[in-house]
Curated annotation (Swiss-Prot):
<dbReference type="GO" id="GO:0030855">
    <property type="term" value="P:epithelial cell differentiation"/>
</dbReference>
<dbReference type="GO" id="GO:0031069">
    <property type="term" value="P:hair follicle morphogenesis"/>
</dbReference>
<feature type="region of interest" description="Linker 1">
    <location>
        <begin position="122"/>
        <end position="143"/>
    </location>
</feature>
<protein>
    <recommendedName>
        <fullName>Keratin, type I cytoskeletal 28</fullName>
    </recommendedName>
</protein>
<comment type="function">
    <text>Essential for the proper assembly of types I and II keratin protein complexes and the formation of keratin intermediate filaments in the inner root sheath (irs).</text>
</comment>
<keyword id="KW-0416">Keratin</keyword>
<dbReference type="GO" id="GO:0005829">
    <property type="term" value="C:cytosol"/>
</dbReference>
<comment type="similarity">
    <text>Belongs to the intermediate filament family.</text>
</comment>
<feature type="region of interest" description="Coil 1A">
    <location>
        <begin position="86"/>
        <end position="121"/>
    </location>
</feature>
<feature type="region of interest" description="Coil 1B">
    <location>
        <begin position="144"/>
        <end position="235"/>
    </location>
</feature>
<dbReference type="GO" id="GO:0005198">
    <property type="term" value="F:structural molecule activity"/>
</dbReference>
<keyword id="KW-0403">Intermediate filament</keyword>
<dbReference type="GO" id="GO:0045109">
    <property type="term" value="P:intermediate filament organization"/>
</dbReference>
<dbReference type="Pfam" id="PF00038">
    <property type="entry name" value="Filament"/>
</dbReference>
<feature type="region of interest" description="Coil 2">
    <location>
        <begin position="259"/>
        <end position="397"/>
    </location>
</feature>
<dbReference type="InterPro" id="IPR002957">
    <property type="entry name" value="Keratin_I"/>
</dbReference>
<dbReference type="GO" id="GO:0005882">
    <property type="term" value="C:intermediate filament"/>
</dbReference>
Length: 464
């Protein structure tokens, strides 16, 4: 709400308000109220204020009412927007409530001032006043009400827009915070995935190596079996030929027993080879299993070291940021200190320049006073000589007369001859600092005049 006074002052209320100015029969009335309300991120806040003043025929009364109510609630799902900032939000709401109350007090004072002016205007220009002005403003009541309603609606709309902007800003801040948290988690998960991918690649290489070794061992076993079968066939063929020969040569030899013995011998040899191959395979498999377990332990240890190093890196980054902030603050302090000392140095130099100027002026004045004093001294000596000449001319019988003005002294008539001597003693006093620079200088001059006559001696000292 905006009010324009005759003296050019202006009061503005940014919250919804209503006011009316209505002339009555022999009196005046004014009422105003303001209300504001809104919700921020699942919480509510409302305040209501009101005040009024009026006068009736035959008397006047003034009254004001201030009511305020604050209702603060928090609601939300999935943590809400105030999951970790309740204290900050409460502080912000308290600050806003304090600002609203200050605005209300200012509005009450402005309303009281306006009511006093309206009352004075009606007392001065209203019906029954000394000027006898009797105007009927009833035809403007509808226009006033319409404008008042428009002002109320505009103020309410403005307040709603402001609250929506605040809500949108808070929501944007909350989404930004969530985005930053999710981004951090995403980066950590990606780092873990990359580490697991490296471990998976290593395990894949190990598995491929094991498969190659298994294939080579399988081929070797197949080759050994094939060789064994070929040897068995060759031995069986050789044994069969011998049997035929022996049967022809010596039919009394038992070939079945011989074949059984050879079969048992080769079966034992094959069983021994199989056991040796199986033992060698088991040994190789055990060594490979141990190597795989060792590699898994090394990968786990490397993963733990990587996690620890990542934590150390984050800690060092935080320390680096804190050190950078400390460095920036120290640089700002250094710059501020340098600027302060430069300012003080400039002030001291200005004071030194002013003192040097004053010293130069004092020296100039001192030299001028010295020249003036010397001129006056010469005039004085000249006058004394003229006076002595006049005395000698007046007293022709040989008496002498001496007379001096100012600082001089004389003795009458005992001498016809006057011998005078003037001595000027100058003393220079200088003040030096620790570096030997002259801070100030003063000159003291003392003039000693000695007059010799026939019957006496007169000494005269004139300080300067």
């Amino acid at each position: 709400m905006s009010l324009q006074f005759s003296n050019g002052s202006r009061h503005v209320c940014l919250r919804s308000g209503a006011g009316s100015v209505r002339p009555l029969n022999g009196g005046a009335g004014f009422a105003g109220s303001s209300a504001c309300g809104g919700s921020v991120a699942g919480s509510e806040f409302s305040c209501a204020l009101g005040g009024g003043l009026g006068s009736v025929p035959g008397g006047s009364h003034a009254g004001g009412a201030l009511g305020n109510a604050a209702c603060i609630g928090f609601a939300g799902s999935e943590g809400g927007l105030l999951s970790g900032n309740e204290k900050v939000t409460m502080q912000n709401l308290n600050d806003r409530l304090a600002s609203y109350l200050d605005n209300v007090r200012a509005l009450e004072e402005a309303n009281a001032e306006l009511e006093r002016k309206i009352k004075g205007w009606y007392e001065k220009y209203g019906p029954g006043s000394c000027r006898g002005l009797d105007h009927d403003y009833s035809r403007y009541h509808l226009t006033i009400e319409d404008l008042k309603n428009k002002i109320i609606s505009s103020t309410t709309t403005n307040a709603n827009v402001i609250l929506q902007i605040d809500n949108a800003r808070l929501a944007a801040d909350d989404f930004r915070l969530k985005y930053e948290n999710e981004l951090t988690l995403h980066q950590n998960v990606e780092a873990d995935i990359n580490g697991l991918r490296r471990v998976l690649d290593e395990l894949t290489l190990c598995r491929t190596d094991q498969e190659l070794q298994y294939e080579s061992l399988s081929e070797e076993m197949t080759y050994l079996k094939k060789n064994h079968e070929e040897e068995m066939k060759a031995l069986q063929c050789a044994a069969g030929g011998n049997v035929n020969v022996e049967m022809n040569a010596a039919p009394g030899v038992d070939l079945a027993v011989l074949l059984n013995n050879m079969r048992a011998e080769y079966e034992a040899l094959a069983e021994q080879n199989r056991k040796d191959a199986e033992a060698w395979f088991n040994e190789k498999s055990a060594s490979l299993q141990q190597q795989i377990s060792h590699d898994s332990g090394a990968a786990t240890f490397a993963r733990s070291q990587l996690t620890e190093m990542r934590r150390t890196l984050q800690t060092l980054e935080i320390q680096l940021q804190s050190l950078m902030a400390t460095k920036h603050s120290l640089e700002c302090s250094l710059t501020e200190t340098e600027s302060n000392y430069c300012t003080q140095l400039a002030q001291i130099q200005a004071q030194i320049g002013a003192l040097e100027e004053q010293l130069h002026q004092v020296r100039t004045e001192t030299e001028g006073q010295k020249l003036e004093y010397e001129h006056l001294l010469d005039v004085k000596v000249h006058l004394e000589k003229e006076i002595e000449t006049y005395c000698r001319l007046i007293d022709g019988d040989g008496n002498s007369c001496s007379k001096s003005k100012g600082f001089g002294s004389g003795s009458p008539g005992n001498s016809s001859k006057d011998l005078s001597k003037t001595t000027l003693v100058k003393t220079v006093v200088e003040e030096l600092d620790q570096r030997g620079k002259v801070l100030s200088s003063r000159i003291h001059s003392i003039e000693e005049k000695t007059s010799k006559m026939t019957n006496g001696k007169t000494e005269q000292r004139v300080p300067f």
